[in-house]
Amino acid sequence: MQHNAGFTRDDVVMAALEIGVDRFTMGKVARLLGVSAVDLGRSVSSRDDLLVACLERVSADITLPPAGLSWQKYLRQLADSLWDVLDANPGLDHILIDLAWAYVPFMSVAKRAHSALVSGGLRSEDAYLALSCTLSTVLTSHRQAA
């Protein structure tokens, strides 16, 4: 195996995302980067550490609908945006459904979406319910369609 000492944590995250968040192993990531699994320890402490980093990356890349929309239009565009994120990240639907803690890196996105729904005319508690229903529907539909 060729030793690639120049890789970064970002390289490790991108390799894991390329493999798929539900399918990557430390060995597969190391092979893709041309390093040993032990070398990955310089950038990530465990598979869970890498999974959290992947989820944080995906969360940071989510494009929410523009502010100022009615709550109905916002939810429709949000559902489309979430579907696109799931399409771009194979296995993400499985991870978000199967791992109880996997939603945590997405909380700041959810808070921004909640604020937009309230600004669009929903009461706060209704906005939480609408987000929960929309996310559940998109996740389960995407998982079934895959």
Please state what every model-predicted region is.
Residues M1-K28, L32-V35, E56:
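Short, amphipathic alpha-helix enriched in basic
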Residues D11-I19, R57, D61-L64, Y74, ...:
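Solvent-exposed, amphipathic alpha-helical segments
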Residues A16, P90-H94, K111:
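Glycine-rich, often proline-containing surface loops adjacent to acidic residues and nearby aromatics
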Residues I19-V21, G34-L51:
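HTH DNA-binding helix-turn interface
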Residues V44, D49-V58, A100, P105, ...:
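Alpha-helical DNA-contacting segments of helix-turn-helix folds
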Residues T63-P105, S124, L131-T134:
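Hydrophobic alpha-helical connector segments
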Residues V109-A146:
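Hydrophobic alpha-helical bundle segments that form small-molecule/ligand-binding pockets
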